[in-house]
Amino acid sequence: MTAAHTRILELRAELDQHNYRYHVLDEPSIPDAEYDRLFHELKALEAEHPDLVTRDSPTQRVGSAALSAFTQVKHDIPMLSLGNAFDETTMLEFDRRVTEGLDLPVGDLFGGGAAVEYSCEPKLDGLAVSLLYQDGELVRGATRGDGTTGEDISVNIRTVRNIPLKLHGSGWPATLEVRGEVFMSKAGFERLNASQLEVGGKTFANPRNAAAGSLRQLDSKITASRPLEFCCYGVTTDISDTHIGNLQQLKKWGMPISHELKLAKGIQDCLDYYRDIGERRNSLPYEIDGVVFKVNSIASQRELGFRAREPRWAIAHKFPAMEELTELLDVEFQVGRTGAVTPVARLKPVKVAGVTVSNATLHNMDEVARLGLMIGDTVIIRRAGDVIPQVVSVVPERRPENARAVQIPESCPVCGSHVERTQLVKRSKGKETVSEGAVYRCVGRLACGAQLKQAIIHFVSRRAMDIDGLGDKTIEQLVDEKLIGSPADLYTLKYEQIIDLEGFADISSKKLITAIENSKTPTLARFIYALGIPDVGEETAKVLARSLASLERVQKALPEVLTYLPDVGLEVAHEIHSFFEDSHNQDVIGALLSPQACGLQLQDQGELSAEFAASTTLGGLLDKLHVPSVGPGAAQKLADKFVTLEGVIKADWLDMRQALPEKQAKAVREFFDNADNANHALAIEQQLKDFGMHWDSEKKVVEGLPEAGHTWVLTGSLELMSRDVAKDKLESLGAKVAGSVSAKTHCVVAGPGAGSKLAKASELGLKVLDEEAFVAFLAKHNIPV
């Protein structure tokens, strides 16, 4: 090894150590001038010996040639969002759920129960990122994106000075994924804006926007010039048995963690921490919008698991939003995907929490009435959750004499169609109650440009039909040029029509045609979600597809039958039923599925879910009818006494009295004396028979499936299918798919990148399948891949 090479290695090690002491320990050991001298010495030596330059050298943070675009990165483990709390009541409820979920005794606020230990740290207002280390070296940085897919920002991440390019010490896993927040301090933000003003550049509204904009620069040299910092808040591979232990170990390896990190013993400690940080919020060197609390025990986190898009073991306690006074200049109306006509406040521009606000949500006309809002009023504006501006209240003493009432338009501001007022109806326990509220809708449907654009945007989105290349602006062009009038028209678009659109050339036009063609075989769940049924999100669409397993059954299902599905209440069930009853929607769906028109072919259709089919009983059906005064217990007594629905309907008063007290017996008799009620009950029963899920039907039950009673765990990435698809296939065999490994786990499917779950499975001696073996297992049970 030459003297120059030796000196280069010495300088790198020394500079790395100084970086660590400065950025992580906050204990600088040398003056800045001495650091600069060492840095420039290293830079000069590397210039003389370019063959000795390595990616992990401190000099390589300065940026490189500009990129044309960021590439997408799929997160092996999704970067989930957190549930929010805006008051102490919600925090207490969160603690209660955690305590009950861990089967601990629930005590009062100040003691008497088993206090859960929580980690506490400020919620930085920046951009969430993932850092991937291989053998201790930083190999990739990615944004959170939508939680599943982000952008590869590796070149820019390497310019953030307190992110170690190589981990310190030893003992780190071969693959380590660290997660945290890239942010800009208040002082750094002020310096950046001052320098931008000096050169006539664009200034930023707040540190978060500055951090996000800087990190997503295609030219990494610009990113390198910005005062960005990183703070680690988690890791995907457990390296300790507690969350705080994980962070402390990461700190030893060179990762900056929050100086405010603290362990709280019980919810009262959490509330005290929140109040303390809130009082010191303005004096902190960075902006925060709340505090994050996490169950500290990793084992407890695994036991609590996840729901939909967030962990059950963590919550963000947000600070109250900041408020300002301004003038309401006007109220305009916008039209949404479902035709709802909603008011939007146009405001005299005012800065709220560092952001200039000129528009604010008013939700609906009921909100306008509740506020007593008039055009010309002075209003209080709040950034709810520090994000969405909203009008909180009116200052009545400042109302001018010429203030005007807010009037809902009689015709749609977009298409001119009639605006219809529909009274809101609440359904609870079989009763329909007309509420004071109302919704205003444009009756133009897809003839209304606003509704059509929003419907198409939703239809083609990544989690729906996933048609790449159809951005919002392209959809606006297609609608404005009258090239499409419904989602079905997308499938009749020709190359000659697309190439004439702004922003399209030969290759991009052909790519769009191919993307549209490739979308013709969606899964049933994606198709249901793409239809844009009110109140039906991605998870509900998956439940509908997994349980009913055919579009025909979903279309025909009565509301009471739909309520057998997990997490589908009567309100949502009525929305689903009403959507498919609508003749206009039937026409659009018919065109999409017609071989002569669009020719979509839905995948994953088949037999009714065995678990769903086995979920019905006569007592359960009687309970779903919501007979006044009759709850689940009384319904089961009727089922035990009369055995059949027809027997209940035809039972006379004396027979009824043998099963129930007088008041309940009278209520049941009066209910079924109404022919509409009796006929509706029989119609529900007939549908249960038609679907093969009647309690007397010969049907497959979950216990008869090959993997019934077995718990499986999926970890790592799979190449031939997503983990969601793998989960669906296992559940179709009767298996339960869990998020954590335990002694009760039957089998673990481990793909590339499998971490602690695979290690735990090996430790417990559990059966482990790689993807090839898993595919063979599915084939054995005639499950296609």
From Swiss-Prot:
Biological processes annotated in GO: DNA repair; DNA replication
Q: Which residues form the active site?
A: 123
| Membrane-spanning ranges | none
List the Pfam families: BRCT, DNA_ligase_aden, DNA_ligase_OB, HHH_2, HHH_5, Nlig-Ia
Cofactor(s) listed in the protein's UniProt record = Mg(2+); Mn(2+)
Q: Which UniProt keywords apply?
A: DNA damage, DNA repair, DNA replication, Ligase, Magnesium, Manganese, Metal-binding, NAD, Zinc
Q: Which reaction does it catalyse?
A: NAD(+) + (deoxyribonucleotide)n-3'-hydroxyl + 5'-phospho-(deoxyribonucleotide)m = (deoxyribonucleotide)n+m + AMP + beta-nicotinamide D-nucleotide
Which GO terms of the cellular component aspect does the record hold?
A: cytosol
Which Enzyme Commission numbers does its entry carry? 6.5.1.2
Report the residue ranges that make up the BRCT domain in this protein: 702-785
Residues that hold Zn(2+) according to the record = 412, 415, 442, 448
Q: Which InterPro entries match?
A: BRCT_dom (IPR001357), BRCT_dom_sf (IPR036420), DisA/LigA_HHH (IPR041663), DNA_ligase (IPR001679), DNA_ligase_AS (IPR018239), DNA_ligase_CS (IPR033136), DNAligase_adenylation (IPR013839), DNAligase_N (IPR013840)
Annotated positions binding NAD(+): 32-36, 81-82, 121, 144, 181, 294, 318
Q: Which GO terms describe its molecular function?
A: DNA binding; DNA ligase (NAD+) activity; metal ion binding
- Alphabetical list of PANTHER family matching this protein: CHROMOSOME TRANSMISSION FIDELITY FACTOR 18, DNA LIGASE
Q: What does this protein do?
A: DNA ligase that catalyzes the formation of phosphodiester linkages between 5'-phosphoryl and 3'-hydroxyl groups in double-stranded DNA using NAD as a coenzyme and as the energy source for the reaction. It is essential for DNA replication and repair of damaged DNA.
Q: Which HAMAP family does the protein's record reference?
A: DNA_ligase_A
Regarding protein family, the annotation reads:
Belongs to the NAD-dependent DNA ligase family. LigA subfamily.
Q: What is the protein's name according to its record?
A: DNA ligase
